[in-house]
C-alpha cells in the first residue's frame, strides 16, 4: 500500500495537477505558490533554532492549537513554524501573531517531504486534527523527531480502519509519539485497533 500511495502521489504531482491547472485557477495558484516558495534561497535560516512545527489544513484547525503554542512560547529560545495546505489559511497568516514563520506544505511526495523537513529542522512536530501525511510522518519517524497528533477525532467507519488501508494507516498512526483525541469514543476506536499511543485531551 505504501508503494501504491507513492505512485499515486507522484502522478498527482507530475501529471494530474499540471493538467488540471490549465482549467482551474485555484490549482494553478496551488502549484505556483509552492514553486515560488521552493525557489527562494533561505540559506541556513532554521539550522540553529529550536524549531517547533505545527501543521493545519486551515485557520480554523490552527486555532485549536493556540493554547499549546502559547505554552511553548514561554521558552524564548523556541521558534514556531506553521504550515498550511490550503490557500485560505495561508492568506490569513498576517493575522497570526504567535507564529515566527509560515509556509505552504509541499505535496507529500518522498522527496518533497524529506527536503522540507531538512529545511525547517524541527525538534517537535504537531499535526492538527485530521492531518495525516504518510511520507512526512514516515520521515519524521526515521529521523526520530517527536511527532504528535492533537485534537484528533476517530470513528470506526473511518477509512483508516477499512481493508485494504488498515495496515498502512495503523503503521502511520503508531509512528506518532502521542495522539491526543477529543473524546473517549475516539480513544476506544484506536485502542480496539491496537493503537495505544493515545490520550483523551477533551
Ranges and model annotations:
Residues 17, 21-202:
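Active-site and donor-binding regions of nucleotide-sugar-utilizing enzymes
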Residues 1, 5-12, 16-23:
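Membrane-interacting alpha-helical segments
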